[in-house]
């Protein structure tokens, strides 16, 4: 399942032309995400859920993905010590952007495009095993 989701993520990101800059690039990513099949969206959501479940299992207080300093890794802060999780693989900025936008609803993507950022409160609900991201 994870391998399939990562493959889907890489295929979608590969469709993003190098010539698209800044917010135009984010909007193009949003268009690609909107065209995903329900199966692809489900696979990407489960991939993100796996990262969040791991976060919970290792008692991490936060997760960091996609910053320029990330080196393409997903980072967890565990008891105040922030480290890359190299065993989760390497991702490009576009791959992180596709993954993050794939869990956002359309209104959140519109908020991102209009405000050029997405300050969010993200909660992992153990009861429903779902990620909730809401603009703040």
Regions found by a protein language model. Give the residues of each.
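Intrinsic-disorder signal
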Residues: 2-11
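N-terminal "pre-motor" subdomain/linker immediately upstream of P-loop NTPase catalytic cores
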Residues: 3, 17-136
């Amino acid at each position: 399942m994870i391998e399939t989701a990562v493959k889907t993520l890489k295929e979608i990101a590969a469709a993003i032309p190098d010539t698209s800059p800044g917010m135009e690039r984010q909007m193009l990513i949003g268009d690609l995400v909107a065209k995903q099949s329900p199966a692809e969206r489900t696979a990407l959501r489960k991939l993100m859920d796996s990262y969040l479940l791991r976060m919970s299992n290792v008692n991490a207080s936060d997760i960091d993905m996609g910053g320029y300093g990330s080196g393409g890794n997903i980072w967890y802060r565990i008891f105040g010590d922030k480290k890359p999780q190299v065993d989760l693989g390497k991702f490009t900025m576009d791959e992180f952007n596709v993954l993050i936008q794939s869990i956002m609803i359309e209104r959140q993507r519109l908020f991102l495009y209009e405000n050029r950022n997405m300050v969010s409160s993200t909660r992992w609900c153990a009861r429903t095993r779902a990620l909730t991201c809401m603009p703040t």
